[in-house]
Amino acid sequence: METFANGMTLDVTVDALAPGGKAVCRHEGRVIFVDRGLPGQQLHVRLTTVRKRFAEAECLAVVTHTADECDPFCPHFGDCGGCTWQNLPYPAQLAWKERFVRDSLQRIGRIEAPNVLPTLPSPLQQGFRNKMEFAFTTDDREMLHLGLRRRGGHEVVDVTSCGLQTATTCRVVTTARDIARASGLPGWDDAAHRGFWRFLVVREPARGGQCLVQCITAPHPEAEHVARAFFTALRQAVPEVTGCVHSIRSQNSQVAYGDATVFTEGEIVLTEKLGAIELDFGHDTFLQTNTRATELLYGEVERMAGLSGREHVWDLYCGVGSIALWLAEHAATICGMEATPASVEAAQRNAQAAGCTHCDFVAGDVRALLRSRSKGKAQEPIPDVVVTDPPRAGMHPDVIDALLQTAPARIVYVSCDPATMARDVGLLMQRYTLHEARPVDLFPHTPHVETVVLLSNKEVDDTISTTV
């Protein structure tokens, strides 16, 4: 067997795709994960990491293409790290996402034959994002850039167009880049931890017509003055910009989130229509980025919850209350729990505007909130159904323990990561039965997938049926 070493180059054939999108190849019986590639392609690769049981590699060239490929629609594809599957036909993307969910439940959750339904496609495959995050940087020639991260690195690609965002967002980015360059202040330098311009976040409801722009900069004596001039020029050039937020970020980590808000201008609360409900949201609240596909996702949550109007529901990690309000007309009471105070305030406003007086939202760490409820310290009834939509890391073991102790009849688990979902579902299987899992594609042209899972309490009802 050939000895692997970092820097070695090989020709390999892609056998499959791994969750996260890496290409799975084999060479003399050893597995190699390559940063890009499609099944059937022959790649020329360079090994970057060698482990005992596998190796990682970067693709230097595609030696042989496959007949199953399609032409990417974006001029930045292959350079920008935003979406990696534009050359994979959409039906194949859906099939691989279903496989990722099934494989995760089998391999991580140790569920022998999980009932995984076909992936629901996104109604839109282009122009679907209601939020985009862009990064500033300055190169060695002192040229400022604003765009998306280059694949596998910290450099920024000046995107001139993007198939995932709207035409309005494209105009905002192009204009903002020109204004920032004219300021003479540098973009952020990751290595040196210095610079002024850091991030631009654009949020635009699906119905269009207005957008909210957040500019995040480093602290600077003239930061507010520069930012006000920036927004004045931006709003003159792009009238759809109806609200502006200037935030500062002192931390070095590359996260598009401000430590503090310096000032706001205009309308800083937007409204998104989701099915029959309307949701207010701002720059610091979470909302799914694909509105039309989110309606399909929530439709699956509603179907699996199987509410008749008599049930008490807990909505964990509820955000701005979107799932709670979607289910409100079918539930007796709903209690939403969320760690971010701004999101809870938005959820309360949304519920009040919708006339949902039976919906309550509580701010606090979900672990602590569940702990107090499991000890009988809260006034809410014991839930019949729990909907949980945790962050990518999944649920803390304490949350899982609290759910096992509370033992609702049904748990509907909404996940953005098949691996952590499968881990959590596997732990819940000691008291629950997995009825079905439904992947939903909120992120076309990427390997990311949302999943809705239905679990039923073995001691309460082991014969649940749902209509697909």
From Swiss-Prot:
Gene3D superfamilies: 2.40.50.1070, Nucleic acid-binding proteins (2.40.50.140), Vaccinia Virus protein VP39 (3.40.50.150). Coiled coil: none annotated. One of its GO terms (biological process) is RNA processing. Residues 3-61 form the TRAM domain. Its EC number is 2.1.1.-. The keyword S-adenosyl-L-methionine applies. It holds the Pfam family TRAM. It comes from the Bacteria. [4Fe-4S] cluster binds at residues 74, 80, 83, 162. Belongs to the class I-like SAM-binding methyltransferase superfamily. RNA M5U methyltransferase family. This is Uncharacterized RNA methyltransferase DVU_0924. The lineage of its organism: Bacteria, Pseudomonadati, Thermodesulfobacteriota, Desulfovibrionia, Desulfovibrionales.
